[in-house]
Amino acid sequence: MFARKPPGAAPLGAMPVPDQPSSASEKTSSLSPGLNTSNGDGSETETTSAILASVKEQELQFERLTRELEAERQIVASQLERCKLGSETGSMSSMSSAEEQFQWQSQDGQKDIEDELTTGLELVDSCIRSLQESGILDPQDYSTGERPSLLSQSALQLNSKPEGSFQYPASYHSNQTLALGETTPSQLPARGTQARATGQSFSQGTTSRAGHLAGPEPAPPPPPPPREPFAPSLGSAFHLPDAPPAAAAAALYYSSSTLPAPPRGGSPLAAPQGGSPTKLQRGGSAPEGATYAAPRGSSPKQSPSRLAKSYSTSSPINIVVSSAGLSPIRVTSPPTVQSTISSSPIHQLSSTIGTYATLSPTKRLVHASEQYSKHSQELYATATLQRPGSLAAGSRASYSSQHGHLGPELRALQSPEHHIDPIYEDRVYQKPPMRSLSQSQGDPLPPAHTGTYRTSTAPSSPGVDSVPLQRTGSQHGPQNAAAATFQRASYAAGPASNYADPYRQLQYCPSVESPYSKSGPALPPEGTLARSPSIDSIQKDPREFGWRDPELPEVIQMLQHQFPSVQSNAAAYLQHLCFGDNKIKAEIRRQGGIQLLVDLLDHRMTEVHRSACGALRNLVYGKANDDNKIALKNCGGIPALVRLLRKTTDLEIRELVTGVLWNLSSCDALKMPIIQDALAVLTNAVIIPHSGWENSPLQDDRKIQLHSSQVLRNATGCLRNVSSAGEEARRRMRECDGLTDALLYVIQSALGSSEIDSKTVENCVCILRNLSYRLAAETSQGQHMGTDELDGLLCGEANGKDAESSGCWGKKKKKKKSQDQWDGVGPLPDCAEPPKGIQMLWHPSIVKPYLTLLSECSNPDTLEGAAGALQNLAAGSWKWSVYIRAAVRKEKGLPILVELLRIDNDRVVCAVATALRNMALDVRNKELIGKYAMRDLVHRLPGGNNSNNTASKAMSDDTVTAVCCTLHEVITKNMENAKALRDAGGIEKLVGISKSKGDKHSPKVVKAASQVLNSMWQYRDLRSLYKKDGWSQYHFVASSSTIERDRQRPYSSSRTPSISPVRVSPNNRSASAPASPREMISLKERKTDYECTGSNATYHGAKGEHTSRKDAMTAQNTGISTLYRNSYGAPAEDIKHNQVSAQPVPQEPSRKDYETYQPFQNSTRNYDESFFEDQVHHRPPASEYTMHLGLKSTGNYVDFYSAARPYSELNYETSHYPASPDSWV
């Protein structure tokens, strides 16, 4: 199309090659504003007129040919659009592979048109030469080597998208400033393999089409020295790599300057500008194939002088056309380097190719009045812009689902067939395949892009060059031009690959007038906004053709568009906008966006489902957005999500739906609605199928894959949250067929594999722990143990030996008791069939999986959950609790629990200590713990002079309290254990705590330690040893004002101090000597009082308020011996960290919901705050681990539980069982 100039023959006015000095930038070339006729006579004037008339005819011919060629392209685009509409998804997914490059061959008729264009160019060349030879035209103003400027933007950009080309036939003055540079193909930063690896490149020739050859990628060129003539500015000339002046091949680089800078530095042609972003740049070459690449160069912290960011291209877009035989080349132009403009006052126009006007309406009006004359707008007469949303025939955008590590593609927006005012978008947005849901399970990028910022691909359109966008590293102002001018498009190559944080950077920057801008105004100074109009671009108001950012109401309105691709793109853009921005999330809710997104869940197109779910997941992420969660529920969002989950087979959509449900489940108000609407579907459609429970004979590899399923992980996370919603929620989940079996199967199949530490296993364990909470009180099997059984246990145990000698009554009762006992050996009584369903929650067979987790798992949350489950199961006087305690001893679980006391994790130590306390309710367990675990328990107490104080000081008050309570239970009615506590140095530490007067420890800890000391003083036989060690009665009892009235009655009187933090209830005396029958009678008479107190405690506990001291003492007197932990909900941020007492209906300690990435990025990093933003495990509040020992005047679960179920004062463990396996290991 263009004749190549021989090496070294560039005219004086041609743009210098890189090796030329920067002063050559003054010699930029353009057509003179007017023809110089002052030195010629009349004949010269007539000759000039004839030449100009000839040129005008050529322009008209060019316009006609261009129209014909554009018509051909529109026909091809229409055919492609019809093919695309016939597919189900309306996308070009077959073309989304990053390993392929497609070449759209031109029609046969286009060859003829291009030949005519070439012929026309030669005629224009001859006219210009005639003007120069006659002396009319200064050779420095125009050279034949630069005749490509005669082309209209339509002629030069024929390989833009058929769906809406920017380029249209124009006049001789063509909105293009062209400069010629000489270079060799070897010096171009060719993009061969990398181009294929990072984005699609469609090769379209503007003239005689040649196949695109992707040769081997040359080594990245070193950063060249600063060359101002080639650095980009508002009117950005292209910059070239270093090349010898006598290069064998020529490459034409020309730029379309939206806002050329005014003349500066005394030169009317060169205007260096610093800190300006490059605009769309094109490179062309003689009749060779052309390939486009558009690296992205933006940063959320760029200097304010850069132009306002656009809807899709908030950074400069550099489009380079390479010669044949070369790989597609990318030249990344950082927006902050200095540059020079090669422009002409007449021919440098604002063509806005690939970008759009960034001036606000006011500024553009002033700008137009100052800069434009009446001849500037003839170009726009035929170049009308098409509204992107219309997506009419030949210009409807395709929606291609592409890999997350690829860059979004440029979308053409104009069509000569559709005269619609421009509105908001210039590219179709595409969400990424958001499959990385946690830092530990994120999908890493390919090696070429690991650790770099990479946006997800925007949809490609038929026959359109894919233009990947990339960020450059201009973060904090202008960078050195030498280091930034020639960045390779490779993300890791070159010293200029200086990128900002790839995770939280904004990809798109709205315009100045958009209230949703994430970076604020970014207009350059007024002085830099001047541009020179051409003769044909002065008539019309340029504001008609300026592109702007979409306003939020417009994007929300597009959710109702008639084309699914527009709806999908709008939803994906909303997902991007609201990422990490709670204000935008609230605004979307106020403008009705949530309702429209919920409506899209029932759409027929899969892509719409995907984008809508992604937007909803971001909208309902975070504690600050509970209003959005409730709004989604009020819009019918939960049933809509459930319907979509039930009918879709797309794995990504199932992940998104379950992710939205997980986010919703962290809101307390939505837990029961989720259980009502989604529990059955989550269980039957996700958990059971993905667990593999129904087909247990599956291969082992499938089991491992199931555990890594994000859908299963999300579903179990959702149920983990809702399982803490209260008694009704637990009851429904226990009764849900297959749920308990599937959760246990997930755990059992993970044992011995690397998946034992996975989040899915953690969620399953925590669900089972919650469902194990208050089993005896909330299940029908537990409630069968009513008053008759209580009476039998009371009579048989209370009278002790007297019952044996009193005749048939006592013997019968003892016989019944012995039949109900199981000491860990032989078959279980009352258990003829294998357990199933809810029975598996309390059956002793569940002990072994829990103990295996405790011995093999390294996930502290899983360890805490398993220990808490055993703690819940071993609580109380229910016969299954007795069996659980025996089973733990049989399975050698006590050493496992004691070993966990030594790990450096406060929450795990707290859970294990409490579990040991419940295990010590069994007499044999108590003996073993006192013999083998006393030193470990004492070691965990703060204080003393040993070298382990540092670790103890780091323990929370809850953990210290739990250890004290365990010690108290171990020494109760066991003098040998009390002596072992003294021998282990426990007295010194306990006295140090009790005498701290609250300076170092909370009152709760002080009181718990005082209770242990008081219990030790009750053993009169040990007092001499205490005095021998230097201790007196003052050290044991003086600091505990609450036990004054019990100080005179030692254990020899067979009485446990009634205000002991552990022995606070009738049930709490299970391991003490039998009480008198009169006490047993009084216990039964107080039953109604217990129930009333329980209701009162429940009320105050639910309110999270302190009860009165009277209520607290009553609750203590009615408590049970077992220390029950509250339900272990999934961590949730919404619980109050200053809450002093846990609730009967517990909540989660920290939020486990998540928000996805920005929809157009994929990174090895995964989440922002929680699950889909950053899976950060927030430390549970102290309230969740408050030991409910009557140490605070608050209603708590122990009070509530004991009031609801006033069990026997004595436990099964009172007697010894000779056949029990009592060995420690």
Swiss-Prot record:
InterPro entries per the UniProt record, alphabetical: ARM-like, ARM-type_fold, Armadillo, Plakophilin/d_Catenin
PTM entry text: O-glycosylated. Phosphorylated by CDK5. Phosphorylated by GSK3B.
Residue windows of the ARM repeats: 394-438, 540-579, 582-621, 626-666, 682-724, 728-773, 835-875, 882-921, 975-1018
Listed GO CC annotations: adherens junction; cytoplasm; dendrite; nucleus; perikaryon; plasma membrane; postsynaptic density
SUPFAM superfamilies the record matches: ARM repeat (SSF48371)
Compositional bias segments (type: Pro residues): 217-229
Keyword tags: Autism, Autism spectrum disorder, Cell adhesion, Cell junction, Cell projection, Coiled coil, Developmental protein, Disease variant, Glycoprotein, Methylation, Nucleus, Phosphoprotein, Repeat, Transcription, Transcription regulation, Wnt signaling pathway
Subcellular location per the Swiss-Prot or TrEMBL entry: Nucleus; Cell junction, Adherens junction; Cell projection, Dendrite; Perikaryon
Main location: nucleus
PROSITE patterns referenced in this protein's UniProt entry, alphabetically: ARM_REPEAT
Tissue expression profile of the protein: Expressed in brain; highest expression is observed in fetal brain.
Family matches, as Gene3D superfamilies: Leucine-rich Repeat Variant (1.25.10.10)
Residue segments, region Disordered: 1-51, 87-117, 134-242, 256-312, 432-483, 514-542, 1042-1077
Residue positions where Phosphoserine is found in the record: S267, S276, S327, S360, S415, S461, S514, S1065, S1076
Coiled coil (UniProt feature): 49-84
Family of the protein in this entry: Belongs to the beta-catenin family.
Assembly behavior: Binds to E-cadherin at a juxtamembrane site within the cytoplasmic domain. Interacts with PDZD2. Interacts with ZBTB33. Binds to PSEN1. Interacts with ARHGEF28. Interacts (via the extreme C-terminus) with FRMPD2 (via the PDZ 2 domain). Interacts with CDK5. Interacts with CTNNB1. Interacts with GSK3A and GSK3B. Interacts with DNM2. Interacts with CCDC85B.
Function according to Swiss-Prot or TrEMBL: Has a critical role in neuronal development, particularly in the formation and/or maintenance of dendritic spines and synapses. Involved in the regulation of Wnt signaling. It probably acts on beta-catenin turnover, facilitating beta-catenin interaction with GSK3B, phosphorylation, ubiquitination and degradation. Functions as a transcriptional activator when bound to ZBTB33. May be involved in neuronal cell adhesion and tissue morphogenesis and integrity by regulating adhesion molecules.
Protein name: Catenin delta-2
Organism: Homo sapiens (Human)
Gene: CTNND2
